[in-house]
């Protein structure tokens, strides 16, 4: 847009302000930079058409460059030089760093950053800030606003002798302010300077002609309708806008001015309507406040009624328990008194012994008859001791499972919105957390709010909230070895559903270690089949194995086929997970040092003698006899849908204690600091087996297969993983 066009546009707006249709204060918020929250200073127009100060753009890019360098250094892992997948904190940095740096520069230059106005990523391209237009119109309006704000402060003449006079004009060509006398002296009639453009007193001087940022010597004289930005004729002939539809600057100026003027007139004409709508909104806000408080009071009343019913039932149940307790204690007391009387029968026994001394038969029979009845009764009590009452109160255990379920489903009337349900099968935690939920199609929600918090035994932590438009969300930066609770609620219009049932998930004990299967070191392509992504391997128990079996004689057996991870570990804590296919016959998983792997891989592949004791990492009897807690490897056996705990001299070796159902997903936690390796059930994040391991050497994730079998590495949870799940 030309200089005269911009000034005409500004003059039109200032005319509206002068007429009182628009106050200068009302446009103040349009003159504030969204980054620094101050009046614009040398504003630049971003590709998203928002403006931002020149210094703010530089600060944003420098901040992102610093954060890139910091994150890169923090996440460098000497023990994992071939680590491919970044940590969650790197996702944003990767997203904002794209190709855009000087050819001879070794450090990538950040050219993408989120616009502070719309929060969408804007790409500055290879030219960076130099490719942005300066918003002269906005700059002029800001300067006029500053002048209106400091009307009492005059701009002095730049050429007067001391003391200077107040300026009355500013020359845009000379970039100076003049009083009337100095202006006449320095712009004499009949000279070229007399044709200079002048405006009211200002301190903001701008170039008279807009130059193309891509072709710095060319003037802007056309407007690209596709990119919606001014261009020069070279841009149209062979530049980035060669195949775009362009129009003349005068035509674009006329069209845009008509649209802007029409829209401004419409907005000004609707001022009374807007004020009426604002009043209506104020009434609606007050009504909403009252209705919300009334709804809270009604909810409190309903819950208080439930509390009263519960208190009444509680009192009744406790009274019944107390009555039963008192009755039983009374029976025990009576029985105890009876047995206390038996102790007092010592005198009866003595009396009976004296009666036995009576020699007169008639006198003896007369006395002994009743005495015998008393002795017989005491004897029967001793022979058949039975407590007078039961001590157990099992019949008085309150069953609240049904009521608890009903209370958990407590919701609003059907006029509200149904409660979403979290899909436990599709929700999981690995390097990040993936939470998936579903909602009835007949009651589709506009949006959802996912809430999560870390479960802490010491104190109650507040819930973190994330607004989601879909029915799934990936949550990053969760703490390791922690337990989190997740719940979701739905929104439809102004209606909010209650929260769903909470889902409890456990995070891995250490950061996820990313690797792929190594297709070079020890990989036997005759027996093993590796996919293109190198995250899945299968054992082919087919024709090649039958050919190998021809050479197997009595006392010989086939060896394992090993495959390892392509990245070694020398320090730190690492966790990885995988799935063993249910049809697998025999699979060994764990860790092994590079030296031990070379020893295993040097052994004959097709057949070996049983006299050669191959190190399996567990179950052989010789290993039981010489259990070494500092061995440089640890492997466990999985097969036929069972997980076998290795034998140990310190624990029970009974089969029922060693054979467990095979988990759906198995995790391995290697702690080089403590020199141990743990095997986890990923579904419950529960440790199944722990063993010491020598971490003085480089350790590799190790796998071995025999017969039919398959291993699938757990895929990290990323945005691509979420897209794949949604497609399924």
From Swiss-Prot:
What UniProt keywords are attached to this protein's entry? Coiled coil, Cytoplasm, Cytoplasmic vesicle, Cytoskeleton, Disease variant, Metal-binding, Repeat, Transferase, Ubl conjugation pathway, Zinc, Zinc-finger
> Zinc finger regions (B box-type), where?
154-192, 207-249
Q: Which parts of this protein are zinc fingers (RING-type)?
A: 33-84
The protein's annotated catalytic reaction(s) are: S-ubiquitinyl-[E2 ubiquitin-conjugating enzyme]-L-cysteine + [acceptor protein]-L-lysine = [E2 ubiquitin-conjugating enzyme]-L-cysteine + N(6)-ubiquitinyl-[acceptor protein]-L-lysine
Question: What are the GO MF terms of this UniProt record?
Answer: alpha-tubulin binding; ubiquitin-protein transferase activity; zinc ion binding
Q: What is its EC number?
A: 2.3.2.27
The UniProt entry, under InterPro entries, shows:
B30.2/SPRY (IPR001870), B30.2/SPRY_sf (IPR043136), Butyrophylin_SPRY (IPR003879), ConA-like_dom_sf (IPR013320), COS_domain (IPR017903), E3_ligase_FN3/SPRY (IPR050617), FN3_dom (IPR003961), FN3_sf (IPR036116)
The record's section on Gene3D superfamilies has: 1.20.5.170, 2.60.120.920, 4.10.830.40, Classic Zinc Finger, Immunoglobulins, Zinc/RING finger domain, C3HC4 (zinc finger)
Q: Name one GO biological process term.
A: mitotic cytokinesis
| Domain B30.2/SPRY stretches | 508-720
The record, for SMART domains, names: BBOX, RING
Origin superkingdom: Eukaryota
**Domain (Fibronectin type-III): residue spans on this chain:** 419-510
Q: Note the SUPFAM superfamilies from the entry.
A: B-box zinc-binding domain, Concanavalin A-like lectins/glucanases, Fibronectin type III, RING/U-box
Q: What general EC class does the enzyme of this chain belong to?
A: transferase
Q: Which PANTHER family did the record assign? A: E3 UBIQUITIN-PROTEIN LIGASE TRIM36, E3 UBIQUITIN-PROTEIN LIGASE TRIM36-RELATED
| Family to which the UniProt record says this protein belongs | Belongs to the TRIM/RBCC family.
Q: What does this protein do?
A: E3 ubiquitin-protein ligase which mediates ubiquitination and subsequent proteasomal degradation of target proteins. Involved in chromosome segregation and cell cycle regulation. May play a role in the acrosome reaction and fertilization.
What does the annotation say about its assembly with partners? Interacts with CENPH.
Query: Can you say what this protein is called?
Result: E3 ubiquitin-protein ligase TRIM36
Tell me the classification of the organism that encodes this protein.
Eukaryota, Metazoa, Chordata, Craniata, Vertebrata
| Gene name of this polypeptide | TRIM36
């Amino acid at each position: 847009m030309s200089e005269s066009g911009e000034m005409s546009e500004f003059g039109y707006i200032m005319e509206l302000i002068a007429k009182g249709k628009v106050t200068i204060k009302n446009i103040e918020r349009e003159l504030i930079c969204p980054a620094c929250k101050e009046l614009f200073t040398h504003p630049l127009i971003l590709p998203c058409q928002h403006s931002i100060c020149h210094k703010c753009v530089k600060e944003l890019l420098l901040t992102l460059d610093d954060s890139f360098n910091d994150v890169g250094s923090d996440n460098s892992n000497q023990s994992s030089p071939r680590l491919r997948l970044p940590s969650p904190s790197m996702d944003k940095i990767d997203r904002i760093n794209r190709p855009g740096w000087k050819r001879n520069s070794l450090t990538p230059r950040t050219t993408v950053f989120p616009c502070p106005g719309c929060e969408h990523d804007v790409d500055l391209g290879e030219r960076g800030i130099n490719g942005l237009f300066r918003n002269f119109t906005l700059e002029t309006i800001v300067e006029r606003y500053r002048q209106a704000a400091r009307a009492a402060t005059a701009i002095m003449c730049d050429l007067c002798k001391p003391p200077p006079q107040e300026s009355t004009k500013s020359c845009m060509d000379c970039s100076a302010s003049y009083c009337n006398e100095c202006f006449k002296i320095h712009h004499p009639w009949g000279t070229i300077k007399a044709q200079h453009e002048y405006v009211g007193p200002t301190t903001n001087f701008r170039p008279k002609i807009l130059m193309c940022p891509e072709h710095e010597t060319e003037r802007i004289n056309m407007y690209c309708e596709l990119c919606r930005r001014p261009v020069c004729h070279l841009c149209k002939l062979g530049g980035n806008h060669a195949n775009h539809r362009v129009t003349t600057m005068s035509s674009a100026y006329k069209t845009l001015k008509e649209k802007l003027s029409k829209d401004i007139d419409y907005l000004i004409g609707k001022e009374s309507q807007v004020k009426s709508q604002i009043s209506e909104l104020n009434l609606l806000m007050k009504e909403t406040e009252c209705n919300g408080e009334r709804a809270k009071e009604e909810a409190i009343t309903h819950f208080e009624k439930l509390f009263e019913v519960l208190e009444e039932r509680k009192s009744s149940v406790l009274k019944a328990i107390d009555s039963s307790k008192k009755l039983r204690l009374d029976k025990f007391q009576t029985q105890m008194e009876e047995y206390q009387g038996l102790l007092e029968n010592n005198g009866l026994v003595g009396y009976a012994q004296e009666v036995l001394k009576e020699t007169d038969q008639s006198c003896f029979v007369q006395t002994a008859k009743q005495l015998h009845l008393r002795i017989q009764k005491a004897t029967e009590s001793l022979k058949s001791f039975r407590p007078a009452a039961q001590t157990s109160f099992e019949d008085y255990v309150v069953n609240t499972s049904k009521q608890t379920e009903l209370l958990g489903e407590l919701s609003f009337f059907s006029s509200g919105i149904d409660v979403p349900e979290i899909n436990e099968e599709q929700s999981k935690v690995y390097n990040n957390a993936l939470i998936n939920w579903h909602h009835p199609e007949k009651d589709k929600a506009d949006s959802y709010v996912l809430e999560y918090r870390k479960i802490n035994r010491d104190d109650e932590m507040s819930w973190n909230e994330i607004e989601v438009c879909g029915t799934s969300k990936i949550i990053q930066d969760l703490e390791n070895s922690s337990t989190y609770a997740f719940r979701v609620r739905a929104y439809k219009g102004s209606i909010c559903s209650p929260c769903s049932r909470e889902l409890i998930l456990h995070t891995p004990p250490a950061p996820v270690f990313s690797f792929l299967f190594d297709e070079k070191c020890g990989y036997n392509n005759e027996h093993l089949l590796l996919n293109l992504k190198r995250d899945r391997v299968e054992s082919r128990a087919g024709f090649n194995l039958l050919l190998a079996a021809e050479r197997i004689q009595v006392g010989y057996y086939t060896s394992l086929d090993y495959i390892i991870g392509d990245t070694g570990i020398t320090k730190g804590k690492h966790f990885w997970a995988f799935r063993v296919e249910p049809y697998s016959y025999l699979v060994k998983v764990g860790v092994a040092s590079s030296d031990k792997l070379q020893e295993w891989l040097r052994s004959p592949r097709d057949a070996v003698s049983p006299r050669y004791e191959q190190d399996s990492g567990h179950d052989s009897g010789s290993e039981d006899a010489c259990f070494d807690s500092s061995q440089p490897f640890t492997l466990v056996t999985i097969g036929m849908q069972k997980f076998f705990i290795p034998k140990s001299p310190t624990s029970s070796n009974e089969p029922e204690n060693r054979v467990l159902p095979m988990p759906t997903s198995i995790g391995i936690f290697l702690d080089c600091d403590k020199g141990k390796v743990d095997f986890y059930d990923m579904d419950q994040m529960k440790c199944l087996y722990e063993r010491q391991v020598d971490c003085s050497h480089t350790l590799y994730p190790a796998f071995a297969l025999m017969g039919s079998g398959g291993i699938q590495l757990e895929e990290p949870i990323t945005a691509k993983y979420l897209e794949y799940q949604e497609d399924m």
